[in-house]
């Protein structure tokens, strides 16, 4: 299942959420993201974007595989605080490298809220890779602390997700969900609170064919 989502805020500004214990299923992903594996994953995503944009000719970079049972994965391209494109996958689509490559390539062209991303735009964009977990269904979206917790809104019209720190208020998140056509009546929606581990860095390879990214990823939380 593909998910369209808004992933901005803490991931785009670099602001850290208050310290808190991660959901157990995300602990291995936090360790993965903070180590060399996170650098490899960001490099493989950058390469996939490069190939999708027609600026590289082949996929060669491979990251270590899923460090634990697969989690939903999102890839976002952003310019400052503005989301340029974002797509996610609830299910693994092969290895972690294969899944991230496919989602990254699709994010370039398949986010129906935005025009396709042009190759030359990558030079000014940042890429974010997010793993989510700790899902908890809620009857009241206002029970979410938007600065510390993520909110996913699911309806028959689609899905929108907000990372921890993206929505300053839940009212804003609900308004944004309505604006993009996902949400109508609250009673028709399913609300899920979640946590996220996010890697972020430039969207372009500093050296197209290096086996390891030369820039250190930013990791939240």
Give residue spans per PLM region.
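Positively charged n-region of N-terminal signal peptides that target proteins for export
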Residues: 1-4
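Bacterial N-terminal signal peptides
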Residues: 6-14
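Basic nucleic-acid-binding interfaces
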Residues: 22-221
């Amino acid at each position: 299942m593909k998910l369209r989502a808004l992933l901005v805020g803490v991931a785009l500004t670099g602001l850290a959420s208050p310290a808190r214990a991660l959901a157990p299923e995300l602990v291995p992903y936090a360790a993965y993201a903070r180590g060399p594996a996170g650098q490899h994953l960001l490099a493989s995503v950058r390469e996939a974007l490069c190939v999708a944009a027609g600026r590289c000719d082949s996929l060669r970079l491979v990251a270590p595989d899923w460090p634990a049972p697969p989690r939903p994965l999102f890839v976002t391209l952003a310019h400052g605080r503005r989301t340029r494109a974002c797509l996610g996958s609830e299910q693994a689509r092969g290895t972690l490298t294969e899944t991230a490559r496919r989602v990254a390539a699709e994010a370039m062209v398949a986010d129906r809220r935005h025009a396709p991303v042009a190759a030359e735009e990558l030079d000014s964009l940042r890429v974010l890779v997010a793993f989510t977990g700790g899902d908890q269904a809620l009857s009241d979206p206002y029970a979410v602390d938007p600065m510390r917790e993520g909110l996913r809104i699911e309806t028959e019209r689609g899905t929108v997700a907000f990372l921890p720190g993206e929505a300053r208020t839940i009212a804003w998140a609900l308004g944004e969900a309505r604006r993009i056509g996902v949400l109508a009546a609250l009673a028709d929606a399913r609300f899920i609170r979640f946590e996220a581990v996010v890697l972020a860095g430039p969207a372009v390879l500093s050296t197209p064919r290096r086996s390891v990214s030369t820039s250190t990823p930013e990791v939240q939380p």
